[in-house]
UniProtKB/Swiss-Prot annotation:
Native species: Mycoplasma mycoides subsp. mycoides SC (strain CCUG 32753 / NCTC 10114 / PG1)
A Pfam family: KH_1
Protein name, entry field: Ribonuclease Y
First-tier enzyme category under EC: hydrolase
Subcellular location, principal: membrane
Domain of life: Bacteria
Matching HAMAP family: RNase_Y
Lineage, opening ranks: Bacteria, Bacillati, Mycoplasmatota, Mollicutes, Mycoplasmataceae
Transmembrane segments: 5-25
């Protein structure tokens, strides 16, 4: 019995659970159906509202477009009316002008008819008068015409010749005056310093006691200056003064700076002299470059190779007929620029050509060839303008001048060289003689350096110990004596010294 009740309860619970699930499912379905319906109704409502909004916006845009169209149409109509009115006015003006032209044309036609009648009458009168003149003179019309032309021609030729002669004289006088004015104006604008070339530098001493130290034991220090520096050290009775003498201004400047530095340092001995000479040589190279840079800055020259700048600076230590070449080149540059300015030519190019016209003199004592040829080679090497190159080649008439600037540079060069006090031939001849001696010595095989001292009366030949032996010294000496006799004239006795010295240096650690 209990079992049956339990079974019935179990069945009843199962049926109840199944019914509950079914009812829950139906309820859930109905709820979802209502939710969907509400969503559909909401979406439908929103769609209707959007449709109304779109239609409203469309009507508004159509209305605005219609209004805009009407306004444009009205404006265009007004513009057309205005144009039409202007055309009508112009048409009326044209009609009036046409009437005026027609009236004038009629008057002109009448005037032409009147003129033709008058011309006909004048022609008749002219024929009548010509006939009377022919009868009176016994000449026909053509004969009288030829006679008149001949007389007028002779008179005109005489007058023309007179006019041409006067014009030629006036042009010659005027051109000469203009040329003089241009050159005078250019020279007035240039400030020139008058300088004379020296072959000695004076070194001031704080005390005469230093003279003995400068000479050194057995004159070793002075010999070091002569052999290594290529200069003469002159120690005389002049108080507190030592003279550095050399025709080569670069060597003289290096030796002067070396001696001044050694005096400050206090240690004066051959090794110190040699080291200081090398140091001052390097410093002088820097000074040469700075001189070149300051020169191109002074003349406002741009875009120039640094090696060419160094050569310009080197001209400071080169002379020609006693005239400093750098000062001469700057003077020629300024004169060329001033003349070019007066003539309306390229001033910058004229200044550049004037500065570089003697650039070959920076190396003519080191290489074979004239300064003109060497200068042109330098200009070509550093890509200078062809006009500049021609100025260098033609300033001594070696080549034909190809531009006005070339002629200007040649004129400026002549003015600079010919002014009073600019050049002194004696010292230049002396320098040429000394240079020739050194060239002869350096051309002998085995000779490393040659120094001409004491106006050429003392010649030092420094032999390369790796090339020439002690046995070769006599041969080198004889060769030098023979060359000097044949090529150089020096009055008095000449002492030639051949020096072969070899040093071995090592560092012990």
């Amino acid at each position: 019995m209990n079992d049956d009740i339990i079974i019935l309860l179990s069945v009843f619970c199962g049926i109840f659970f199944i019914c509950f699930i079914i009812c829950s499912s139906i309820a859930l379905y109905l709820w979802k159906s209502k939710s969907r319906k509400r969503l559909v109704e909401q979406y439908t409502k929103e769609a209707k509202q959007a449709k109304k909004q779109i239609l409203a916006n469309g009507y508004k845009e159509i209305s605005e477009a219609k209004m805009l169209f009407l306004k444009r149409s009205e404006l265009e109509k007004n513009e057309l009316d205005r144009v039409k009115e202007q055309l009508e006015l112009r048409s009326n003006d044209l009609k009036r002008n046409q009437e005026i032209v027609e009236s004038k044309s009629q008057r002109l036609d009448a005037s032409l008819l009147d003129l033709e009648k008058r011309k006909f009458l004048l022609d008749k009168k002219e024929e009548y008068l010509i006939k009377i003149l022919e009868d009176a003179s016994g000449l026909t019309k053509s004969q009288a015409k030829e006679l008149l032309i001949k007389q007028v021609k002779n008179k005109s030729e005489k007058e023309l010749i007179s006019i041409l002669k006067n014009a030629e004289l006036q042009a010659h006088s005027s051109s000469k005056m203009i040329a003089n004015n241009i050159i005078i104006s250019a020279m007035e604008r240039i400030k020139v310093e008058l300088t004379s070339q020296r072959t000695t530098n004076i070194v001031k001493l704080p005390s005469d006691d230093l003279k003995g130290r400068i000479i050194g034991k057995d004159g070793r220090n002075m010999k070091a200056f002569e052999q290594i520096g290529g200069v003469d050290i002159v120690v005389d009775e002049t108080p507190n003064t030592v003279v550095v003498s050399s025709f080569n201004p670069i060597r003289r400047e290096i030796a002067t700076r070396t001696l001044e530095q050694l005096i400050i340092d206090g240690r004066i001995q051959p090794i110190k002299i040699e080291n200081e000479l090398k140091k001052q040589e390097q410093e002088l190279e820097y000074i040469i470059q700075e001189t070149g840079l300051s020169t191109i800055k002074e003349l406002n020259i741009n875009d120039i190779d640094i090696e060419l700048v160094k050569l310009i600076g080197k001209l400071k230590f080169r002379t020609s007929y006693g005239q400093n070449v750098l000062a001469h080149s700057i003077e020629v540059a300024k004169l060329s620029g001033a003349i070019a300015s007066e003539l309306g030519l390229d001033v910058e190019k004229a200044i550049r050509a004037g500065l570089l016209h003697d650039i070959g003199k920076a190396i003519d004592f080191e290489k074979q060839g004239s300064h003109v040829v060497l200068g042109a080679e330098i200009a070509k090497k550093y890509n200078e303008d062809p006009i500049i190159i021609n100025c260098i080649e033609s300033h001594h008439e070696d080549k034909e001048k190809e531009s006005e600037i070339a002629a200007i540079v040649a004129i400026a060069d002549s003015i600079s060289a010919s002014r009073p006090g600019a050049r002194y031939n004696a010292i230049d001849e002396f320098i040429l003689r000394m240079t020739e001696i050194e060239k002869i010595g350096n051309s002998i095989p085995g000779v490393a350096k040659t120094y001409a001292l004491q106006s050429g009366r003392q010649i030092r030949l420094i032999v390369n110990p790796l090339v020439a032996s002690d046995l070769d010294l006599a041969m080198i000496l004889e060769k030098m004596k023979e060359e000097i006799k044949n090529k150089v004239i020096i009055p008095g006795e000449i002492t030639i010294t051949v020096i072969r010295e070899r040093k071995e240096t090592d560092v012990l650690k």
